[in-house]
């Protein structure tokens, strides 16, 4: 399985200069807007706190908002800034790939504890997603009735039963707690983004769940640039 949680990072700072003098009736409140790119989030936040920048226009990780001290001299606006996703490789070419089986891909939904991710990893700053349309999407209501029929929730026992049934039907055997196909352990290559603590944690958690099921998981770590090369 190859994994990539897609979220391109662009850090932009907006600096606004207020006109101190009179202006025409149809004039603007500013005479200049500067956009400055910061690659270091810590530097950008300190610049805002010190009054050198008026706005930091990008998401802030939840661990930086845990207490009143971290919010000091900051006014935080909540918005939908992106999402975390897990991509499964469905190819049936090459070595045996359990994710080429639709029912196995379906079962993975029950190995993901979305509430844990939202509450623990994101500090409550998020909502669980069960499709490519989130609850804030205008299209969400169109697919809501379909999503509800799947009853996706964290249920590893159900996932294991589905996966075991499908693998057994393909001739795989579980030997000493490890799934084997044609006398070879079934291996999964899992690419995990290590340049983001949330993505890294999600990858580690799901890897453990897959190992509990009986797969041999080879974890490969890397940043977004490596993901583009390795995954795509």
Map each language-model feature to its residues.
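Aromatic-rich, solvent-exposed beta-strand/loop patch
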Residues: 5, 20-40, 67-82, 174-176
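Immediate post-signal peptide segment of exported/extracytoplasmic ligand-binding proteins
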Residues: 25-31, 102, 156, 160-189
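Structural transition elements
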Residues: 128-174, 194-200
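Bacterial N-terminal signal peptides
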Residues: 9-18
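Short, well-ordered beta-strand elements
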Residues: 30-37, 44, 55, 185-193, ...
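Periplasmic binding protein-like
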Residues: 47-48, 53-57, 65, 211-232
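Short, hydrophobic alpha-helical packing/hinge segments within bilobed ligand-binding/sensory domains
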Residues: 44-45, 95, 104-105, 226-231
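A bilobed periplasmic-binding-protein/Venus flytrap-type ligand-binding module shared by bacterial periplasmic
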Residues: 81-107, 111, 120-121, 193
């Amino acid at each position: 399985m190859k994994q990539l949680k897609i979220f391109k990072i662009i850090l932009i700072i907006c600096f606004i200069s207020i006109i101190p003098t009179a202006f025409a009736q149809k004039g603007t409140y500013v005479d200049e807007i500067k956009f400055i790119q910061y690659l270091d989030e810590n530097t950008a936040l300190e610049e805002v706190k010190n009054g050198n920048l008026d706005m930091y226009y990008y998401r802030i990780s939840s661990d930086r908002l845990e207490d009143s001290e971290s919010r000091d001299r900051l006014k935080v606006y909540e918005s939908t800034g992106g999402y975390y996703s897990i991509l499964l490789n469905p190819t049936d070419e090459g070595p045996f790939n359990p994710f080429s089986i639709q029912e196995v891909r379906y079962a993975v939904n029950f190995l993901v504890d979305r509430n844990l991710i939202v509450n623990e990893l994101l500090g409550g700053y998020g909502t669980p997603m069960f499709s490519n349309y989130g609850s804030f999407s205008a299209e969400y209501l169109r697919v809501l009735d379909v999503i509800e029929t799947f009853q996706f929730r964290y249920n590893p026992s159900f996932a294991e039963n589905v996966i075991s049934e499908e693998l057994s039907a393909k001739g795989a055997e579980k030997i000493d707690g490890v799934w084997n196909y044609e006398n070879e352990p079934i291996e999964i290559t899992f690419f995990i983004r290590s340049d983001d603590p949330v993505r890294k944690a999600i990858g580690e958690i799901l890897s453990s769940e897959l190992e509990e099921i009986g797969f041999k998981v080879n974890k490969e770590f890397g940043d977004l640039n490596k993901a583009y090369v390795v995954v795509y």
